[in-house]
């Protein structure tokens, strides 16, 4: 980052977050509260082992219809019984420039890799403000075919130009499939 820059946006390419617009909400939170702002989704307790999980506390601040919480800590891929919540990190981050120093100071974590979650946790422990925007939309995991294919369909159906034709084609494909497998 240059001298006048103090934030970096990170958008992981294997997460499709719908509908669009969560980054704009995150910018609003950062402008109002400072620090780093992350996107969170609620998952079931059984799913938490796949994610970085937030330990959060409520804020008594209104953000025009979207939920914001203060992050007290993060745990990378905990067993369900040890998860502090069911709010998980979802590939959208506005990180204060301090993240670069934190990344230099952490050691490899889960899987023998440097984990962004560990660097964020270090910043939290050192008093850096971190908040989450709880996104009420959908998240698709593009990192495997089981998530990639439905994500493309979902995204395509929402497209103003291609959505109606895709919807019609999918109805026909489903009807043909059901007839073939009946």
Report the location of each language-model feature.
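Conserved beta-loop-beta/alpha segment of the NTase-like Rossmann-fold superfamily
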Residues: 1-58, 95-97, 103-106
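Intrinsic disorder at enzyme termini
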Residues: 166-182
């Amino acid at each position: 980052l240059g001298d006048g820059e103090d934030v970096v946006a990170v958008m992981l390419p294997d997460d499709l977050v719908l509908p669009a617009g969560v980054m704009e909400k995150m910018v609003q939170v950062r402008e109002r509260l400072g620090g780093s702002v992350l996107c969170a989704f609620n998952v079931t307790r059984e799913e938490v082992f796949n994610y970085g999980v937030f330990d959060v506390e409520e804020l008594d601040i209104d953000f025009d219809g979207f939920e914001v919480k203060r992050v007290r800590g993060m745990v990378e891929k905990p067993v369900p019984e040890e998860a502090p919540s069911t709010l998980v990190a979802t590939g959208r981050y506005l990180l204060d420039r301090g993240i670069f120093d934190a990344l230099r100071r952490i050691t490899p974590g889960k899987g023998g890799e440097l984990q962004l979650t560990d660097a964020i946790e270090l910043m939290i422990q050192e008093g850096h403000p971190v908040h989450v925007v709880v996104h009420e939309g959908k998240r698709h995991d593009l990192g495997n075919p089981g998530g990639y294919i439905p994500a493309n369909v979902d995204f395509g159906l929402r497209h103003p130009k291609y959505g109606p034709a895709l919807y019609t084609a999918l109805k026909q494909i489903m009807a043909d499939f059901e007839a073939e497998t009946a």
